[in-house]
Amino acid sequence: LYLMHGGWSNETSTLGTPERPSGFKNVIDNAIAQGDFAPLIIVCPTYNNTSGQDSADFSLALRLTRNYHNELVNNLIPAVESAFSTYAAGISADELMAARDHRAFGGFSMGSVTTWRTFEYALDYFRYFIPMSCGTSLDDESIWRAAEGRSQNDYFVMMMVGTSDFSYSYDTARAEDMRASAY
């Protein structure tokens, strides 16, 4: 699971660091220990360019999330999957794409924007997507077109948003649009 942070955050925001793990990391570790989750590798990347404050410039943050898939598929996935035991037979593009059934991408807020961009530009590398609380407009039709020619069973999207979240209207409209999409 590649799990992206939200705006004004970084790669340590969600799970913490080895020295200072977050409460969420402890929840995951305990769920695995109790058999509620199968063991998994969680990678917490960042779309930030040079600073965790890149999110302060909304247009820059959107540009960084739009381009992030390049670093993800060309550098990060090969680095992770060459260092850890995964389902990929190797790290060539074909081998990584062949293992997409065992890979998910999710993110919160601006990480959710990154999740939709990953769906749009790297669907060949991921089967599962977990966008959470995406409070902005995107070119949804362009995103859905990424699935053109694919069976609806070829990918799975689980959107999450709270009913009191400011992004509720964005996400419910996006979910309705996706259901109505030809893809």
PLM feature spans:
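Non-catalytic cap/lid and distal C-terminal segments of serine-dependent acyl enzymes
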Residues: L1-Y183
